[in-house]
Amino acid sequence: MRILLMTDWMTPIRDALNTALPDHDIVTAEPEKLSDAIAQANVLIPARNPITTVELQQGTNLQLIQQFGAGVDAVDLESAAAMGIPVANVPSGPSDLAKAVAEFALFHMIGAGRRFATLQQALAKQSVQTPFGASVFEARVCIIGVGGVGSALARLLQAFDCD
């Protein structure tokens, strides 16, 4: 089976899949060679690439589109269904993906609030005079959606006494 990772930043994932699935051909493709690679692939792992009717029609051997995360919004689900190509994702619950994404969101909340880039420059110059930015502690936070990620983020924010 030929599995196409549609970006070149997935090299560590490709290497791990090659180890785990030695009987399969795990490949990546340069953007200008993507059409040819899709035509030869049995499985697409699109990551950030949109999968439209054009890509689906190129993939005459496609048996599965496996999204590299929870969202499948970049995949033309109607066209895939019409062509009999199943689309799968990584559910946030069983894989702990929600926890990882929530942790990343919290990192960005703290970093943005504390103006991390500016703080990092000041620390490098040893010129920190006063606390930078705003604290997440006791902040009022609005979480849009309480699915796997939103729920995990809410649990993390409890430790910061957030509203």
Question: Where are these predicted regions, by residue range?
Answer:
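Short gly/ser/thr-rich secondary-structure transition/capping motifs
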Residues: 24-30, 45-47, 121-129
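A short, aliphatic-rich alpha-helical micro-motif
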Residues: 37-38, 56-59, 136
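Phosphate/diphosphate ligand-binding glycine-rich loop within oxidoreductases
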Residues: 43-120
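Residues at the C-terminal ends
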Residues: 39, 80-82, 159
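Short beta->alpha connector loops
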Residues: 8-11, 30-32, 47-51, 69-72, ...
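N-terminal glycine-/charge-rich "phosphate-binding" loop or analogous flexible N-terminal tail
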Residues: 1-41, 161
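Rossmann-like dinucleotide/phosphate-binding beta-alpha-beta segment
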Residues: 130-163
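Acidic, amphipathic alpha-helical patches
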Residues: 34, 52-55, 132
